[in-house]
Amino acid sequence: RIESIIDRFDMSFFKNQKISDLSTGQTQRVGIARCLVHDPKYYILDEPTSGLDIISSQVILDFIKEEKKNGKCVLYSTHYMEEAENICDRVVLIHKGEVIEIGTPKEIEKKTKTTNLRDAFFALIGGSKNEME
């Protein structure tokens, strides 16, 4: 099982290194891989793609999608609205520590008359995305 997980996350080239010698992305992958060894029923992932390169991020996102298809529950926090839109069945939008909306991405977009979660978020807080950039 461990070898298949190492292969899944493309970690064979650093499997014998100390964790302190790994990059942020490599450390993230090791953390998620450690969870997989135990075959949990659910995952709680706090910004698992933060600080990762695009390839490592995609490996993590593909893993999450696959685990969801296998019936696993994933609680996923992120600041990346596009990720939430692509992998989450339901989202909770939070602003300044307060819940401002809960629903599927499509429900929230319909309610705010927008076409994506990022625009929906700004519509809900009464600001424009240009003001925040």
Task: Outline where the language-model segments fall.
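Conserved ABC ATPase "signature" region
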Residues: R1-F14
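Conserved ABC ATPase signature
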Residues: K18-L22
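ABC ATPase "signature
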Residues: I102-G103
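Conserved catalytic motifs of ABC-family nucleotide-binding domains
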Residues: D39
